[in-house]
Amino acid sequence: MKEYFLIGIGGFTGAVLRYVISGIIPVKFGIPTGTLMVNLIGSFIVGFLMYSSLFTGISYEYRLFIITGFCGALTTFSTFSYESFSLLEQHYFIKSGINILTNVTGCISMIYFGRMVSSSFW
């Protein structure tokens, strides 16, 4: 039961932060940059914590709270998919392609960057 509570509190916090960040960061050049930003931030955190957990003994509960709850709610694959599809539907093929490319390569890069930053501590 404790695990569900931790995931729920983390999820609530991540969802609220996603709402705030997406509201603050406007669409730039027709690309939904708020969604991109939350996905990049979440990917960095996951990369950092997953690598750190190999060396620090970060508890399973803490990882549930941060990675499953907080980052799971902060990041949003469904919104990214919807926004990319919406751009395609409006015949903004290049903008949709840029959105897809920047989200996928950016998030993978942020996982790597988070891991590299973490490795500098351990």
UniProtKB/Swiss-Prot annotation:
GO-annotated biological processes: cellular detoxification of fluoride
Keyword Metal-binding listed: yes
CC terms in the record's Gene Ontology section: plasma membrane
Modes of activity regulation: Na(+) is not transported, but it plays an essential structural role and its presence is essential for fluoride channel function.
Bilayer-crossing regions: 5-25, 29-49, 65-85, 93-113
Protein keywords: Cell membrane, Ion channel, Ion transport, Membrane, Metal-binding, Sodium, Transmembrane, Transmembrane helix, Transport
A molecular function (GO) term: metal ion binding
Membrane topology: Multi-pass membrane protein
Catalytic activity, as annotated: fluoride(in) = fluoride(out)
Compartments it resides in: Cell membrane
Principal location class: membrane
Matches recorded under NCBIfam families: crcB
Similarity comment: Belongs to the fluoride channel Fluc/FEX (TC 1.A.43) family.
Matching HAMAP family: FluC
Primary role: Fluoride-specific ion channel. Important for reducing fluoride concentration in the cell, thus reducing its toxicity.
Name of the protein described by the UniProt record: Fluoride-specific ion channel FluC
Gene responsible for this protein: fluC
